[in-house]
Amino acid sequence: VDKPKVVLGVSGGIAAYKACDLLRRLTESGHDVRVVPTASALHFVGAATWSALSGNPVSTEVWDDVHEVPHVRIGQHADLVVVAPATADTLAKAAHGLADDLLTNTLLTARCPVVFAPAMHTEMWEHPATRENVATLRRRGAVVIEPAVGRLTGVDTGKGRLPDPAEIFEVCRHVLARGVREPDLAGRHVVVSAGGTREPLDPVRFLGNRSSGKQGYALARTAAARGARVTLVAANTGLPDPAGVDVVPVGTAVQLREAVLKAAADADAVVMAAAVADFRPETYAAGKIKKKDDKDPDPIVLVRNPDILAEMSADRARPGQVVVGFAAETDDVLANGRAKLRRKGCDLLVVNEVGERKTFGSEENEALVLGADGSETPVPHGPKEALAETVWDLVVHRLS
């Protein structure tokens, strides 16, 4: 079986050395990698290093091996092109179709998925020109990973740091798994909630649930691989941030509501995969509640939390916005799911059965996706990414 052919483009930034780790992950997982560094990138990591790590010759100029027409063939033969790091200059050239070196020629001739992992100073990332270039690339179907927040060159700190190579690799893996299928969420903004809210009783204790957040994270990753700009509102998950996704951490149901409503203002779709507490304690004890040997504990009075899914469904931020809910049921899955779908008013409801040794914390899931139009889409037991793909297929159908 032929190995998947990956072109690793490296542009000139201090983060170029991290591309060596990405290259190692790609080659060790069975990919045939051709490295195409820019002239600036070679100031940071030399051609000999790229050749030794990839096991392939390194092409640096359009004039290398002219008889093989490398400025055309490299992109034509690739199954994936990933540019890491992608500087502001490289993003600008790619957005405007410039072809002044081998990497930009390769980007123009590639007919495969393209992933950009930007790295630059915060001011450059936030500049309107860069934002427009990124938006252009995403509209065309490229996956542009959101840069990380952290230490930058010199003493600066902010957004613009190259994402961890392991995260970039995971994005590449998901994009390759989809193959050359159309990036049908390109140019779309989607919001996903994940995890489980916690309602504090005192500084130590809280009311919570067993949601791991893994299904919501799978939804976020697959949406990014399909070209979407993704906002992930994550409640108490403990999971690493998915590459290419803007993560908003929250704790309580009230905080989750605020974050989702803010992110949904310009969203095409909202998927509420988080397990949100129905109730919260009426009062919060400023100090730890002590056990009293001679008295029964005081009762905990609960008040109702806002119904975020029903609110999102009834008051959509923009026309045509698709709203998806999740329901965890212990019995009468279909009947309870249908009743909840009518009650909440969402477009789709993903219903799964939960209980001991079922769903929570596992890497797999099975569900029934109910539509407001009466449709029923069963998803057999399998990876959570498979359920995520089905959900996005149904969302795309409704968006179109």
What are these regions (language model features)?
Residues 1-400:
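A cross-family phosphate/adenosyl-ligand binding-site feature
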